[in-house]
């Protein structure tokens, strides 16, 4: 690990796969307890991050009644999946990324997670996802590329958040959010298209209006200029 900066107070398990030019800040803990952690290159981890903490159960806890994952065993740490983090990600202070159970918890590339975010087991973040401070994602959620989640938003487990989505601050997300949507409130509702983002990406204004009508159920198809962003 000679090309990585690891603060003297940070703990990095010996079996963590670590690329190059990563910075791991004070009092962060990466890996351990049977969790497999793989980290690419050029990532920044702030202070007090916890990467790869597995679930724990007390003796006699009837986990079969709570979990749907057939391969889980509280007595066999080798059955815990891990955490995979790609390249050029920023995780600010006090970010927690839990180990997966049935699949790795994954953060792809160029993601930015502000302070005090929690990513539970089996979540998947595609490229260029942004979490504002205080976002909490329950387990098995997935986030499409370029999705942005506002401050202190909370997401129910198992949800799919589409690509180029904007979720407002303090939202309580209890249902899936389609691609290109603007969603906010408690419970969060899709109120139209993520207009500002599409305009900044160069989508013609008329096509943005058409995409808004589609998300409101007024038309049957998205314009090609919008669909091409998913490629």
Language model: regions and residue ranges:
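Conserved short hydrophobic patches within well-ordered secondary structure
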Residues: 12-16, 112-114, 164
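Surface-exposed loop/turn motifs in large extracellular/passenger domains
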Residues: 15-18, 35-39, 78-85
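Glycine-rich hexapeptide-repeat left-handed beta-helix
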Residues: 2-5, 29-36, 44-81, 93-96, ...
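N-terminal segments that cap or nucleate solenoid repeat domains
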Residues: 1-27, 33
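A general structural signal for short secondary-structure junctions and capping/turn motifs
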Residues: 40-41, 86-87, 174
